Regions:
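Membrane-interface helix caps of multi-pass small-molecule transporters
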Residues: 38, 63, 67, 88, ...
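Hydrophobic/aromatic residues within the transmembrane alpha-helices of Major Facilitator Superfamily
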Residues: 23-30, 60-63, 67, 148, ...
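Membrane-embedded alpha-helical modules
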Residues: 93-207, 320-431
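Helix-loop-helix hairpins and the membrane-proximal interhelical loops
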Residues: 1-49, 162-164, 195-278, 422-423
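Loop-to-helix transition at the N-terminal end of transmembrane alpha-helices
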Residues: 44-60
Length: 431
């Protein structure tokens, strides 16, 4: 049956190799079951229900990817958009988390439509590489600021906006040690470096951080507080235009780039045999709106899947293994509930650091490419909004090409997106 489902021999792999690859991928991304409830919990969402939703959508998305597309790529709620969901849309802009889930649902529907009609590649090709790289860098800076704030390393200040926190406090010390441990373990190529760092700091918090242990295993909590709680009506109002656009664009670049990058590394992008890639695009589109129904922010393909590919994973059995392991995580809810913010902060900061390597992709000799990219990246943390970063980036890019006589270098898609953001600023208002 496994041979018929996954065509193991055709891909030069075995059941044992696929299971090991699945375990490897799971260990590298399991941190999300702690980080996602922590972030969305800050937006007022019930952490226990978010924990269940995270495990379920990671299992469902990965299973669809494995069984339908036969790809060794796992899925889970994405880093970056969960932070935008909680800290920008809910806490900064003042919308309810139910309305934010509605925006995720609408963006997921748009995502599914453009995938079904084959428009996904067309849109991707229309966005300049410099802005695509800048979006990743900007989200990295945004995550970095959130991580430093969560750890207490950076605190607010009336005179200078931000300043250094109390470096003698236990949370700060534990967060710094956790970050160093993650970097060292990652350098040593230890599977699950981020997960080990989170668990290590959490254990230390019981002794030095005043945390309390409430057990390790229990029956899964109820998902009822977040299940089908999305507010689509509010998400369709004019004030949500840029929120939906941000979710859609970031999902588009992040998921597509990850799918193609990991598939290429696995040797699965064979000219003339792109049916599996198309199925994988459809699978990850479906997972986005499914996640919003369960009660979590946008779901995406995980670049950590490359670790499983490196371990020999070539088929959907790898993704299915990840799905089963995420289902098993439903029974460790008590552990997830006691993970403090300063334990997940090192993981956030490490992911942020990795995202900054996209800076190397920029052509710094062409100011019409480099400057809009820099504006995109810098505006995200300094306005505390991924949407504003995208808006100023696209508008600056279009203006730079227009006033240097290089209009033809800008794809029509750039002008359309820049126009949408200009309309939003002048007729709907900023924020």
């Amino acid at each position: 049956m496994t041979e018929r489902l996954f065509k193991l021999q055709e891909h030069g792999t075995t059941v044992r190799t696929e299971l090991i690859a699945g375990l490897t991928t799971f260990l590298t991304m399991a941190y999300i079951i702690f980080v996602n409830p922590s972030i969305l919990g800050d937006a007022g969402m019930p952490k226990d229900a978010v924990f269940v939703a995270t495990c379920l959508i990671a299992a469902l998305g990965s299973a669809i990817m494995g069984l339908y597309a036969n790809y060794p790529i796992a899925m889970a709620p994405g880093m970056g958009l969960n932070a935008y969901f909680a800290y920008a849309v809910v806490l900064h802009m003042g919308f309810t988390w139910q309305a934010a889930l509605g925006a995720v649902f609408i963006s997921g529907c748009l995502f599914l439509v453009v995938t079904l009609f084959g428009l996904r590649g067309l849109i991707i090709q229309g966005i300049p590489q410099s802005l695509r790289s800048a979006i990743t860098v900007g989200i990295g800076l945004f995550l970095g600021l959130i991580a430093l704030k969560s750890a207490g390393i950076v605190v607010g200040d009336k005179a200078t906006l931000v300043t250094l926190g109390d470096l003698h406090s236990a949370p700060v010390i534990l967060a710094v040690l956790g970050f160093i441990a993650i970097v060292a373990l990652d350098k040593a190529r230890v599977p699950g470096a981020i997960l080990i760092g989170i668990v290590g700091v959490t254990i230390a918090s019981f002794f030095f951080g005043g945390n309390e242990f409430h057990g390790l295993f229990s029956a899964p909590p109820s998902i009822a507080p977040t299940f089908l709680q999305l507010d689509i009506h509010t998400a369709l109002t004019k004030g949500f235009l840029n929120v939906v656009l941000v979710f859609f664009l970031v999902e588009l670049f992040d998921a597509t780039g990850t799918l193609m990058g990991v598939a290429k590394r696995a040797g699965l992008l064979v000219p003339g045999k792109m049916e599996r890639l198309n199925k994988s695009l459809l699978a990850d589109s479906s997972a986005i709106f499914a996640g919003s129904l369960l009660g979590t922010s946008s779901t995406t393909a995980y670049v950590e899947s490359a670790a499983g590919v490196q371990a020999g994973g070539r088929t959907g059995m790898t993704a299915l293994t990840v799905a089963v392991l995420f289902l098993a995580c439903l029974f460790v809810a008590p552990l997830a509930g006691v993970v403090p913010a300063y334990a997940t902060a090192p993981a956030l900061f490490f992911v942020a650091c990795l995202m900054l390597r996209e800076l190397a992709e920029l052509d710094w000799n062409d100011s019409t490419e480099a400057v809009p990219a820099a504006v995109t990246a810098l505006m995200m943390p300094f306005t505390y909004s991924i949407a504003n970063g995208l808006a100023f980036g696209f508008i600056t890019y279009a203006a730079a090409k227009l006033f240097t006589g290089r209009v033809r270098e800008a794809h029509p898609m750039v002008w359309i997106i820049a126009g949408v953001f200009l309309f939003k600023f002048f007729y709907i208002g900023g924020h």
